[in-house]
Amino acid sequence: MLREASSLVGLCLALQVAAFSEPLIKFAAPDLVPHGASQIVDHAFASFSFPAHWLPDFAGNNSHPNLFSRDILDLLDRTYYNSSQKESIFVETGANGIPSAVYVGPVYFEAFHNFPGSLWSFQANLANNATWGLNNTLEVCEQVMNTLKSSLITFEIGNEVDLYPCAVRPCDYDIHDYLQEWTTYADAISESVLRGNRYGLDEQKFFQALVFANAELKSFTTPNAFNGGIDLTNHVKSVSLHHYAAGNQAWVRLQETFMNHTAVVANLSIYSPANNYLKSNYPDITFLLGETNSDYTNILMNQVEGVFGSSLWLIDYLLYGMSLNITRFNLIQGTTFGYTGWVPVPTGSMQPYVRPPLYGQIVVADIIGQNPHVQIFPIDLGAEHWKFSAYGVYESTKLSKYVLVNLDEWNSTTRYPRPTQKVTLNFPSGVSSATVQRLLGAGASADSDISWGGLSWNYTHGRLTQSGQPHHEILRITRGMAKLTIPSTEAVVVTLG
C-alpha cells in the first residue's frame, strides 16, 4: 500500500511540474491585412435574439421600461396575436423554458420602444397551420411594422422549419413544401403589409429566409432552397441558420466542449458551405447565425454555462465566426436560460444581475471598437495548442490589436497553482509600446468577481452600474518583439500604441 501511495504522489508531482512549464508560444501577425483575413466586420456583429416570451422581461413596456436591459444594450415561431387581449403576454407552458404557445396583446409591442436606436428583425409565425394562421401573421406583422417603423430591417418567416416534419407538419414535409408556404407568406406580407408603407422599407426584398435549426438536414439545405426558387420573387434579403455548440449530453464538459479552440473551429466550419454558396451565387444576400449560443436545451448546466470559462469561449466563438465571414451572430437570451448574459427581472430570491457571458460580449465590442474598417485574422497555432486561441485585428488594413485567449481550464479548487503561458509577439517597425487589458476571473467556474480592464458591471437600484478603476499594463517592445505572460483561464487584448 505504501508503495502504491508513493507512486500516486510521484504522478501528482509530475503533473504539477508539467502545469508550470508550458512551452513558449510565438505569435506573428503581418503588419498589413493578409490574405485570409475576414471581410470588414459589421459593428452589430454580436447582436441579441429575444424569444417572444422573454421580450417583456428584457424590455418592459412604456410604463415600466427595463432600464437595466436598456443600459446593457445602449422571436419565436410559436407567437399568436390577439387584438382584444388586455394582458401583454400569455404563455402556455412547454419544455426546456420554451412555451408551446405564446399569445400577445397590443401592450406587448411597447417593448420595442424600450431599446431606442436598436434595429430589429421580427420572426413571423409559419408553424401555425390553422386556417386563420396567415391572417394572424399579417395582422401581427403590420402591428410590428407600425411600431418599429424604420427600425425594422427584416421579417423572418418561420422558425427551424427543418424540424417541422412529424411535429407541426406531416412526416413527408420537405423543402419543396416549405418553399411553397414561404413564398405564399412572403408574397402576402409584401402585398398586404409592406406595400405603400410610410417608413421607407423595401416592399419586396425584406425577408430573412431559411431559419433552419441545422446547417443541413435531409432536403433542407441552402442550395436546395435557392435551386428550388426561394428567391424567384426577389424577396430574400438575408439567410439565417441556427447553431448551438452542444446540448446536455453526458459528454459535455467545459474544457473539452467549450474551452477548446479545435471544437470552436469544427462547430462553425460546418456553416462555410452555405456561406460560400451564397457569396458565389447571391453575393448581395447576407448570411448570419440568427439564433446561437452554447446549449440548445436551455437548461441550467451550471458547470459549463454562465461561468467565467463560457465568457472565454464566447470571445473565441465570436472572433472565429468573424474570420469565417459570417455577417452577424444573434446571441439568444432568456430569463431562465443558463447561458444568458444577464437576468433582467427578479427570479426567486435573486435581484436582476449580470452573468459572466456578458463580459465576453463586452470584450468583443471593445475589440471591434469604433473604426469602420475592422478585419479579423485567425492565427493558426496548430492542433497541439487547442487550449489557446489568437487573432490579429486590423483597422484600415493595419495591425492594431492582438487578442489572446488562454483556454486552459483552471479553478480556485484545482490542486495546483494557476499555470501561466509565456508568449512572444511580433510588432511592426516603429511601434515601441502597446497596452494590455485583461479579462480576469477567479477560475473557469467562477460566476462573480469578474473584471475587464479593471472594470465590473452589475445591477443596482434598477440600473446597470460600473465599479472598479480602468486598468491596463504597458508592454515595452524591443526590436519588434515583446514577451507577455497569460495565466490559464484568462483573455488578453494587446492594443498597439
What annotation goes with each model-predicted range?
Residues M1-L24, Y282:
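Fungal secretory targeting signals
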Residues F20-K205, A209, L217-N224:
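N-terminal catalytic cores of secreted or lumenal carbohydrate-active enzymes
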Residues F48, F155, E160, V239, ...:
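Conserved, mostly hydrophobic/aromatic
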Residues P51-P56, R78, N125-A130, G158-P165, ...:
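Solvent-exposed loop/turn segments at secondary-structure junctions
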Residues G133, T137-V140, D174-L314, L324:
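Noncatalytic carbohydrate-binding groove/subsite architecture in carbohydrate-active enzymes
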Residues S294-S389, S396-K398:
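Aromatic/acidic polysaccharide-binding cleft in carbohydrate-active enzymes
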Residues G382-G430, R438-G443, V492:
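Carbohydrate-binding surface patches
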Residues P417-S488:
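Acidic, Ser/Thr/Pro-rich beta/coil linker or hinge segments at domain junctions
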